[in-house]
């Protein structure tokens, strides 16, 4: 009844399943008092989101950033409206720039001036938007 698939284990997960675990979590509001992720934690979580880059600002604080491409202005606008709806639902608000054919999203936790799990949760939820 139980067939063993070559090269798999009961704990093997596809990247999609690994990401969906994160996208199904809820952002937890941060009022400070917790440390921001260190570079090892950042790299662990970065594997769970698709195409996001980690950068540092002038104060050496880490943030996530990703640019999305679209065919025209209206599709960019529709996308950022969906991002805005997710942000409001989650209570976690990214910085957003958009124009003809693109939208750029920057995510970090303001209260700790760095990255926390909620930032990666929001990134995973944004990645689930159709045509993102």
Language model features by range: what are they?
Residues 19-74, 81-132:
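Long, contiguous binding/interaction regions
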Residues 10-18:
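Short, Lys/Arg-enriched N-terminal segments with co-localized hydrophobic residues
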């Amino acid at each position: 009844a139980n067939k063993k698939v070559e090269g798999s284990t009961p704990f093997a997960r596809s990247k999609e399943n690994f990401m969906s675990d994160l996208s199904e979590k809820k952002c937890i509001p941060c009022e400070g008092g917790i440390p921001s992720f260190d570079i090892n934690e950042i790299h662990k979580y970065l594997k769970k989101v698709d195409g996001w880059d980690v950068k540092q600002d002038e104060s050496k604080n880490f943030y996530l950033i990703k640019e999305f491409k679209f065919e025209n202005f209206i599709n960019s606008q529709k996308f950022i409206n969906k991002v805005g709806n997710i942000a409001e639902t989650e209570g976690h608000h990214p910085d957003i720039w958009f124009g003809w054919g693109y939208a750029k999203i920057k995510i970090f936790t303001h209260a700790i001036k760095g990255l926390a799990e909620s930032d990666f949760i929001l990134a995973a939820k944004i990645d689930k938007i159709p045509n993102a």
